[in-house]
Amino acid sequence: MNILKVFGMIFVLILASANLVKCEELNIYSHRQPFLINPFLEEFTKKTGITTNVIYSTKGLAQRLRSEGKNSPADVVLTVDIGRLYIYQDMDLLSVINSKKLSENIPEHLRSLDNTWFGLSKRARIIVTSKDRVKVGAISRIEDLADPRWAGKICTRPGSHVYSRALMSSLIAAHGLEEAEKWATGLVSNLARRPQGNDRAQVKAIYEGQCDIAIINNYYFGKLKYSDKEDQRTWARSLNLVFPNQGETDRGAHVNISGGGVAKYSKNKDSAIKLLEFLTDEFAQNLYGEINFEYPVNPKVEATSELQSWGSFKEDKLPILTIAKLSREAQKIIDRVGW
C-alpha cells in the first residue's frame, strides 16, 4: 500500500511538473517578420527561461484567432500599425491587462484606454527630399506637400496602404474633414507618377530623378543607409530628411507604432504579460532602434545614437487610437481624390 502511495505521489509530481513546463512556453501570432523579433525573443528566453513559438503572417491572423476561439493556442499578438491593433480590439480578441510596469513604460497616448493593446515602438512618417534639387528649409510641414509649387515633384506609395491612411487620419484630426480633403487633393495634383511601390521605391525614384520629394517611414532611411547593396546606400546619400511640423506651436510629426497584446483565451497570461513588459524595458527598447531604426515608446529610454544623429524631433501626441477611429473617413477621402 505504501508503495502504491509513493508511486501515486510520483505520478502527481510528474503531472505537475509537466504542467509547469507547459506554462513556460508562449505561442506568438506575429505580423512582424521573424528576423526582426527573434533577437528579442532569444533574450527574453535567456532572461526568464520561457520559450516561444512564432506563427508569422502578413495578413489573416486576426481572422484565424477569431475562428479558433477558446481553442486558440495563441498567447501574444505582435503587429505593426495602430489600424491593425484596433482590429484585434474591435473583434474582442485581446485580454484586459493590469500591469503597473506597462502603464509606467508606455505613455497614455500610445496604449488603449482599456489596456488591451500597447505600443512597443514608434516610427515617424517623414519627408525626404533630393539634396540636389530641393533647398534645405523649402519644406517644413506635411501640409506643404499640397502647395502647387511642387507640381510633378512628389512620389508616394498608394493612399490605400495603412501608412498612408494613418497619415491621412492624422490630418483629419488636425484640420477636420474638409481641409484634410483639400490637402489630399493638392497632394495628388502634385504627384510625379501614379502611386506605387513601398517606401524604398520612393527613395529610388528620387535618386533616378523621377521625383524630388517623397513620404516614408523613418526606418527605411536607416535600412538603405546600412544596406549590403551599394546602390541602396547611394540612394540614401542623395537624401535630406525632414521631420515635419516641428515649429514651436506646431503639433509635431505624425507617428505610428508597432504594438502587441495578450490573446483573449491565452492559457499563459502571466508569462504573456512578462513578455510585453520585457519589450518595454531598456534592453528591448534599445534593440528596436539598433535592429530596425525605430524610436522607443518608453520615455526613460533615449533613442539610439544613430537615430539621434538624424536630428531630434517633436512627435504629434494625438492619442494613437484616434488614428484608427478615423481610418474609414480617411479611406473615403483617399478614394475620392484618387490617391
Question: Where are the language model's segments positioned?
Answer:
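Short helix-loop capping/hinge motifs at secondary-structure junctions, enriched
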Residues: 132-140, 172-181, 266-272
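Ligand-binding pocket segment of bilobal, Venus flytrap-like solute-binding proteins
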Residues: 170, 175-244
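Short beta-strand->loop
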Residues: 29-32, 94-103, 113, 116-118, 129-131, 137, 143, 230-254, ...
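Early extracytoplasmic/lumenal segment of secretory-pathway proteins
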Residues: 23-87
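A bilobed periplasmic-binding-protein/Venus flytrap-type ligand-binding module shared by bacterial periplasmic
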Residues: 128-133, 255-268, 287-291
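A structural signal for short loop-to-beta-strand junctions that line the ligand-binding cleft
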Residues: 72-77, 95-127, 143, 153-155
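Extracellular/periplasmic juxtamembrane helices and adjacent flexible linkers that interface
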Residues: 278-339
